[in-house]
A protein has these predicted regions:
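Bacterial N-terminal signal peptides that target proteins for export
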Residues: 2-10
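Bacterial N-terminal signal peptides
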Residues: 9-17
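Terminal accessory carbohydrate-recognition/targeting modules of carbohydrate-active enzymes
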Residues: 22-247
Length: 247
């Protein structure tokens, strides 16, 4: 009951505290009821050691949250996940998935638009190579679905920005597993066509250039038992992502 009360209090404070989150760019944003409410919350925050976060995007009863990156402290991906458990409350990563072009590792992206919609985070950013659009929606309490679209038709490279302290990262085929000593786990599940390799306590995933969207499942678990069952669900969701987004 204490956990439930704390979560309700947190989300109520978020809703009451912020306005004008959306900075729409000129690109078309999909139509639908949720897109009529594009300036409700300001949850722009890039994790650092100097300032505190004031609110997170969470949904479907999840205990993980995300924020939009600040335009003046940009990372090219949604920030988080953050563990909302009252006994831990920690950033598992500054950004578990950042996106760039594989042949331009040091290219600088300029933010075009960041936005919170009810049930969705949205961002787009551009470089000299092209524009990358990302959307994040929760599928259930454990997993959020990241959608990535690039207009350049070039190979993409995905990696994490600054995993949290004490987190150990390993790769297993098309899955990245990041474990914290507390028992909390972040798992990133990629589709079979994505090449994933481990680096120095991190990962790099490469995606062939395509006009189609790329999907990544970002999951949060409190222990190994949840992980083993959850990975199968994440893989199933990636096999038909549009069906999960309808739920």
């Amino acid at each position: 009951m204490k956990h439930k009360f704390t979560k309700i209090t947190l989300l109520t404070a978020v809703v009451a505290g912020f306005t004008a989150a959306c900075n729409p760019a000129s690109e078309n944003i999909p139509t639908g009821k949720r897109y009529e409410f594009n300036n409700i919350l300001d949850i722009a925050y890039t994790p650092d050691t100097l300032t505190r976060c004031r609110g997170w995007f969470t949904d479907a009863g999840s205990w993980m949250g995300f924020t939009l990156p600040q335009k003046d402290h940009w990372v090219n991906g949604f920030c988080g996940p953050f563990s909302l458990d009252m006994n831990r409350r920690q950033w598992m990563a500054q950004s578990a998935v950042t996106v760039g072009y594989a042949d331009q590792a040091n290219v600088i992206f300029t933010p075009d638009s960041t936005c919170y919609f009810p049930g969705e985070l949205y961002l787009s950013a551009s470089s000299e190579e092209g524009k990358i659009i990302q959307r994040l929606n929760f599928l259930d309490a454990s997993t959020a679905l990241l959608r990535i679209h690039s207009d350049a038709g070039k190979e993409l490279s995905l990696t994490a920005s600054q995993w949290g302290k004490e987190i150990q990262v390993q790769t297993d085929q098309n899955t990245v597993i990041a474990r914290h000593p507390s028992g909390e786990i972040v798992a990133l599940t990629f589709t079979p066509d994505v090449s994933v390799k481990g680096t120095d306590n991190n990962y790099q995933a490469k995606i062939n250039g395509s006009e189609h969207d790329t999907y990544v499942a970002i999951s949060f678990y409190t222990g190994e038992k949840e992980l083993s069952a959850g990975l199968q669900k994440a893989q199933l969701a990636l096999s038909n992502p549009q069906e999960g987004l309808k739920a």
